[in-house]
Amino acid sequence: MGFITLTMSAVTTYVPLYGSTLGLGNTGYFFTIYAIGLLLVRAFIGHAIDRFGVIATTLPSLVFMLAAMLLLAFAQNLPILLLSGFLYGSGFGGAQTTMQSLSVMNAPSERFGAANGTFFIGFDLGIGFGALLAGTLSDMLGFRMMYLLLIVFIIIATVLVLRFHPSKKSTI
């Protein structure tokens, strides 16, 4: 999860500055649209996990996040920025929920608490290191390249999910 929250940290920290450099005005709407996507997905993701399995719901979430980062990197106007926010919120809402489910699925029942604790350590480390890494990248290469490079972490998360899931048909 740390690889995912690393990108989230960059999005939440630097979208206002990025939008300002693009002359897009009030980027606060980005976060409203992000929250709408997040809430919509979270309202239905539990049922989707039960019906289709964790992997079948995690992968589309990660694809949404990847698409959002691409749109964000190349945004030239507010509607594209807002679409990116919706996709990122939707993807993050799904990815966080499904990855937390995966962390528990890989643990024996007496270790569910430890699995959740470890999950959130990764979550918090991603946020902390993400802002630091994103700041360094944006200073060196600019916001657009920063968002493009951070896609690598979504790809790494995807590879790890595929590598360490209990089975392709796993459900909780």
What are these regions (language model features)?
Residues M1-T32, L38:
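Extracytoplasmic gate region of multi-pass secondary transporters
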Residues A35-A43, I127-G128:
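Residue-level signature of mid-helix packing/kink "hotspots" within the transmembrane helices
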Residues V41-V54, S138-D139:
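Helix-to-loop junctions at the C-terminal end of transmembrane segments
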